[in-house]
Curated annotation (Swiss-Prot):
It comes from Homo sapiens. Pfam families: LIM. May play a role in tumor progression via its ability to activate the ILK protein-kinase activity. Keywords: Acetylation, Cytoplasm, LIM domain, Metal-binding, Nucleus, Zinc. This is LIM domain-containing protein 2. The keyword Metal-binding applies. The gene is LIMD2. Residues 1-24 are annotated as: Disordered.
């Protein structure tokens, strides 16, 4: 059924009755790579090669690659990603415009709050 990539090898074999030798033809066996099972980042099920899609180094089923907001099926040319979440371009723009920045528009704490002024010790001088 399958043929090996290499030529057949001749291997000597001893005849059980007379101790004579004969030649047995064996084909080189081809190695089957152990395939790593890849799982979909959205549904955590096995992804087979025909349904595999990679976006931002994450693996998805074609059908699982959807907008987080409206669940529309996305393609590699029609998505925008932020913080590991995927959006269709219209919703990405709509959510971004609603607050005017990435953090608030997508329900996160504003980055500037992380840099809020801390209380300064009254004994220290500031320039």
């Amino acid at each position: 059924m399958f043929q090996a990539a290499g030529a057949a090898q001749a291997t000597p074999s001893h005849d059980a009755k007379g101790g004579g030798s004969s030649t047995v033809q064996r084909s080189k066996s081809f190695s089957l790579r152990a395939q790593v099972k890849e799982t979909c980042a959205a549904c955590q099920k096995t992804v087979y090669p025909m349904e595999r899609l990679v976006a931002d180094k994450l693996i998805f089923h074609n059908s699982c690659f959807c907008c987080k907001h409206c669940h529309t099926k996305l393609s590699l040319g029609s998505y925008a990603a932020l913080h590991g979440e995927f959006y269709c371009k219209p919703h990405f723009q709509q959510l971004f415009k609603s607050k005017g920045n990435y953090d608030e528009g997508f329900g996160r704490k504003q980055h500037k709050e992380l840099w809020a002024h801390k209380e300064v010790d009254p004994g220290t001088k500031t320039a």
